[in-house]
């Protein structure tokens, strides 16, 4: 250049030679550059790396990334609560002819990755698919695998049984703290529910300790018989009483 700085091509090739690069994977916009780079490698009497070019990601409608979607860097996804292994799963399989499934084993993911499975068409990035995959990944963790992380944010308040319940109702790991706060808290949510008849029936029909897997069904059946409520008319206000939430399990 006029300012004395070097163009991209020669420094790139020299750097690859110096670092003994054997395989180069880059975007399809570099296809024309690759032919030129191969000639540079040969002119410098260097081994020519193997090249592969991947198609560009598009949004869910097949359009180029907008500035909004362009902000979805790996760091931003991590900050938003996506598990590292979720991101790795998604990136290794998006655009391939394989179904994206929850796999926590990094060695398995690496061994099963094959560039031949990558389609030449532009893959569509879907935040909904990524979120669903993150949920599947979390559900695949047993308590022993994740207990240390749980204790860091929940102060040893979560045991194996509680994890088995909460992991079915979270999209992101940090949400477990919300459930611990609800379950362990003594906050009274009944004042937020206007149905006095339902509250009275719920209190009067509450089964005695100890509670088990059948308690919920037995209890809600009694409330239904006492109030005549059913479906969402029963479960939505009951959820509000128990958790303070309008949506959830």
Regions found by a protein language model. Name each.
Residues 1-53, 58-65, 73:
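Active-site cores that bind ATP or allylic diphosphates and position pyrophosphate for catalysis
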Residues 40, 76, 90, 222-223, ...:
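Residues within well-ordered alpha helices
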Residues 65, 69, 73-154:
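A conserved active-site cap/scaffold subdomain adjacent to cofactor or substrate pockets
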Residues 79, 122, 227-234:
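Secondary-structure capping and boundary motifs in well-ordered enzyme cores
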Residues 137-229:
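Small-residue-rich helix-loop
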Residues 238:
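Hydrophobic, well-ordered secondary-structure elements that form the walls
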Residues 245-249:
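C-terminal structured interaction module
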């Amino acid at each position: 250049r006029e300012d004395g700085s070097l163009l991209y091509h020669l420094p790139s090739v020299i750097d690859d030679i110096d670092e003994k690069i054997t395989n180069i994977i880059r975007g399809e916009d570099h296809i024309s550059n690759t032919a030129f780079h191969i000639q540079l490698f040969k002119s410098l009497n260097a081994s020519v790396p193997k090249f592969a070019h991947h198609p560009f990601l598009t949004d869910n409608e097949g359009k180029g990334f907008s500035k909004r979607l362009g902000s979805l860097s790996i760091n931003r996804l991590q900050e938003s609560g996506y598990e590292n292994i979720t991101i790795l799963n998604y990136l290794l399989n998006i655009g391939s002819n394989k179904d994206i499934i929850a796999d926590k084993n990094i060695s398995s993911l690496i061994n099963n990755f094959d560039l031949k499975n990558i389609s030449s068409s532009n893959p569509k990035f879907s935040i909904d698919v990524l979120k669903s995959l993150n949920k599947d990944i979390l559900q695949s963790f047993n308590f022993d695998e994740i207990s240390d992380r749980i204790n860091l944010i929940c102060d040893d308040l979560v045991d194996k049984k509680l994890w088995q319940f909460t992991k079915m109702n979270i999209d992101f790991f940090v949400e477990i703290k919300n459930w611990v706060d609800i379950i362990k808290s003594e906050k009274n949510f009944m004042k937020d529910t206007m149905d006095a008849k339902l509250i009275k029936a719920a209190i009067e029909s509450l089964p005695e300790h100890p509670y088990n897997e059948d308690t919920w069904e037995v209890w809600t059946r009694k409330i239904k018989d006492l109030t005549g409520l059913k479906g969402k008319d029963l479960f939505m206000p009951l959820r509000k009483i128990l958790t303070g939430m309008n949506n959830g399990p």
